[in-house]
Amino acid sequence: MLVVDRELQEFLSAYSVNHSNSFLGKRDEQKLKVRERLMKEGLALFSSTGFEKTTVAHIVEKSEIARGTFYNYFPDTQKLFDALIEELNQNIKAAIQQTRRDSKNVYDYLYGTFKNYFELIGTPQMIQFHILNQAHIRQSSYQSNVIKTIVKNLNRDLKSDFKIKAFTEKYEFLLLSFMLVGSPPELFLATHTTNINFSNDQLATFLAKLFHKVLME
């Protein structure tokens, strides 16, 4: 009887642990889905009406969740906006790293990096998002840890991997890194707020030629 009781206890204990883990897994999955829905609806609203005209009330209405639930994920709309920028920057960082591995020369690296960037932000929704929220995107991006890492990696590459003769001072490489990061979004905004249409390939080719000439010639 003692053996049976012990076996039953062990079975119930194991069941309790497994059931608890399953519950936690489902709960975490549900939390992730809610967060993704908030970010999706937040992006849609920021893209259609702009950050300044978007409120928590608007987001929770579109997301079909309680207002209190929103604050379990973000303290305000600014933090949700920052999370969107951080996610975009993570995708940009991953694309740069992949391009770095695949490129056989400096020009290919520059072109591939710029082309991937323009394709990531070149959808109709992302174009509108950038046009309506220029100042907020700049502020959020340059405070982003991901952007700081991208600048740091570029600075390292420029100083060590590329045979650049025109620049020798450390501060010059840092400024070059900032220009490589800052130029694409400014060119993107300038061209998408005019009536002149440029393809992603044209924009990427122009920047690649420009920076290749500056860096290598």
Give the residues covered by each predicted segment.
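N-terminal intrinsically disordered/low-complexity leader segments
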Residues: 1-33
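Helix-turn-helix
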Residues: 37, 45-79, 83
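Short hydrophobic clusters on alpha-helical segments that form packing/core surfaces
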Residues: 38-46, 92, 117
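Alpha-helical DNA-contacting segments of helix-turn-helix folds
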Residues: 74, 81-91, 95, 129-131
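Hydrophobic alpha-helical connector segments
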Residues: 83, 97-123, 176, 180, ...
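Amphipathic alpha-helical packing segments from all-alpha helical-bundle domains
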Residues: 90-93, 139-164, 174-178, 205
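Amphipathic alpha-helical segments used for helix-helix packing
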Residues: 116-141, 187-193
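Hydrophobic/aromatic-rich alpha-helical bundle segments in the mid-to-C-terminal region
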Residues: 129-132, 162-209
